[in-house]
């Protein structure tokens, strides 16, 4: 029998759903929007269940749930929507277990595939140099140049850059104390150009910073600069310096990681510099464009030069 959303479900499937909806309303206190989402997803799955000839929720096993997830993927369902579907199903089965109507939750071990987030395109070295050719005496321009030099020179996250205090910077040794994710502290070196421009900024910082303000980088109001202000200023400098790519703080960090890996090929060192807990996170930065790979191959492979030299007549 083929069912549609307008086809009445058998009581053995519909009644447990109605009890669950009442449970969501009276005991869980979920918003109407969430309740509607759960109902929509569960009704859809109940009709799939009926189409497959199953007459009771207790007949559902992990294989059926995986089949349902696969069907959603093949139909182009978004990862977030599939995650909502599986979440509602897990909650429903937990409810049936509490009522003694099921022994185990068949959806517990099934998860939606994670949506791969595309990494931003990194800047090439020429673009970075073009961006960092800011050479103005205005205190805000000096601050912005120092921020960009430090972010690219030390591979900082935006939150890390904003949270840096004056006391965290050791100009003589070129060392920076950083508080990263999970409040984990690390010390990182930074570039000579970052040292130069942070030093210039410190000489004019007192003209802007409010008394007692510990932040290294401050706004026009004299307080710690905000994440949004950093993003806005970097984007503006990208346009002003005629850099083709849109400039963002993460793109500078990404460029730092890519350029360091291209130059050193030391994944473990870059992991430490970036503050990644797992090296698998750092490995996403190892993508190199084909041109770079081809150049590296031609320079390193013993047969490559001969191949290039042996041109056919």
Curated annotation (Swiss-Prot):
CDD domains: INT_XerDC_C. InterPro entries: CB (IPR044068), DNA_brk_join_enz (IPR011010), Integrase-like_cat_sf (IPR013762), Integrase_catalytic (IPR002104), Integrase_recombinase_N (IPR010998), Integrase_SAM-like_N (IPR004107), Recomb_XerC (IPR011931), Tyrosine_recombinase_XerC/XerD (IPR023009). Residues 11-97 form the Core-binding (CB) domain. GO terms for biological process: cell division; chromosome segregation; DNA transposition. It comes from the Bacteria. Pfam families: Phage_int_SAM_1 (PF02899), Phage_integrase (PF00589). Residues 118-298 form the Tyr recombinase domain. The active site is at residues 157, 181, 250, 253, 276, 285. Keywords: Cell cycle, Cell division, Chromosome partition, Cytoplasm, DNA integration, DNA recombination, DNA-binding. GO terms for molecular function: DNA binding; tyrosine-based site-specific recombinase activity. It is found in: Cytoplasm. GO terms for cellular component: cytoplasm. Belongs to the 'phage' integrase family. XerC subfamily. Site-specific tyrosine recombinase, which acts by catalyzing the cutting and rejoining of the recombining DNA molecules. The XerC-XerD complex is essential to convert dimers of the bacterial chromosome into monomers to permit their segregation at cell division. It also contributes to the segregational stability of plasmids. Forms a cyclic heterotetrameric complex composed of two molecules of XerC and two molecules of XerD. This is Tyrosine recombinase XerC. It comes from Vibrio campbellii (strain ATCC BAA-1116).
